A protein has these predicted regions:
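Glycine- and aromatic-enriched mobile tails/lids
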Residues: 1-13, 17-161
Length: 161
């Protein structure tokens, strides 16, 4: 409707997604912006009225128990260093299929160790950083494995000996 309500309770839509037909079929960028601002204004007014008469409430989040164990900061720092050194040594500027294979193996082991941290330890920003680092490293190694050519700043060595 013109207040942005949808058929899903407590979900509003504004702008073109609201399908108000405010400007008809002539869709210009300038009218789309105007429609967005206008519908947002009316939706906000309707929402404030709903909140004032308590017709709207946020669901309470479910509580869960956080694991009591904290991950050892030394282990997290060491694993992060392992990821960085692995990338530097095996997936750096000079690459080879053998080095990339070794990097992949090391990173897969690290990923499993980090998964065990997640299962038994409280999640911290450092643990999230470590998880993201190993995921990113695995993506880089995978992409590098798919590119056998020397291109840009990376040089692929041929290991025929």
């Amino acid at each position: 409707d013109l207040d942005g309500r949808t058929n899903i309770l407590n979900l509003n839509a504004i702008g073109e997604t609201a399908c108000t037909g405010l400007h008809g079929a002539n869709r210009l960028a300038s009218t789309s912006l105007l429609e967005c601002l206008t519908s947002a204004h009316f939706t906000a007014l309707a929402d404030s009225q709903d909140i004032a008469r308590k017709a709207f409430s946020l669901p309470q989040p479910r509580l869960w128990e956080s694991p009591p164990e904290e991950a050892d900061p030394t282990l997290i720092a060491q694993d992060l260093d392992l990821v960085q050194q692995t990338m530097w040594n095996y997936a750096g500027i000079v690459r080879s299929p053998r080095r990339l294979t070794r990097a992949r193996r090391i990173l897969h082991e690290a990923r499993e160790e980090i998964r065990s941290f997640y299962r038994r330890c409280r999640v911290t920003p450092e643990l999230i950083e470590l998880r993201n680092a190993v995921r990113s490293a695995l993506l880089v190694v995978h992409a590098a494995s798919l590119n056998p050519r020397s291109k840009g700043a990376h040089y692929v060595i041929n290991e025929r000996r």
